């Protein structure tokens, strides 16, 4: 449309498609070799750790129970909790991939702690078609606590 009375409308036909060449530096992702270390307990095993400057992926396998029976906390070298962005779970619910922020580039290690909440039955709620039990967390038990070198 025109702003002034003498302006004319112009139509341009064409496409906005264009290509941008992108190269991915695969050397940015560093996979920590855990084969030489025993990073497991009777309940939990850390399968792999993969780190980029932007994120970290910790792959955890649960030997007893499944992923929702436990809570994973990851600490950096200074004892600060590393923020977890998301987790994905395998179909059998035994393996969990934890996506978190990357530790500092100067960090030599991380600490992985797996906790099992201790629950106490608070109340039972009976509905017409089902019953539900509500629990209170009264504590937690560390079932896995290891410092893992990442350099």
What are these regions, as identified by a protein language model?
Residues 1-151:
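Alpha-helical, hydrophobic structural elements that either
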């Amino acid at each position: 449309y025109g702003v002034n009375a003498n302006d004319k409308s112009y139509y341009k036909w064409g496409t906005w498609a264009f290509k941008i060449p992108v190269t991915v530096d695969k050397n940015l992702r560093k996979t920590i070799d855990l084969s030489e270390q025993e990073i497991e307990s009777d309940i939990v095993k850390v399968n792999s750790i993969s780190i980029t400057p932007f994120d970290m992926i910790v792959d955890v396998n649960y030997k007893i129970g499944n992923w929702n029976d436990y809570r994973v906390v990851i600490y950096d070298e200074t004892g600060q909790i590393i923020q977890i962005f998301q987790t994905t779970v395998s179909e059998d619910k035994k393996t969990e991939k934890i996506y978190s922020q990357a530790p500092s580039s100067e960090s030599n290690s991380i600490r992985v702690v797996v906790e099992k909440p201790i629950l106490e039955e608070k109340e039972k709620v009976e509905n017409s078609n089902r019953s539900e039990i509500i629990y209170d967390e009264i504590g937690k038990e560390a079932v896995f606590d290891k410092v893992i070198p990442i350099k």
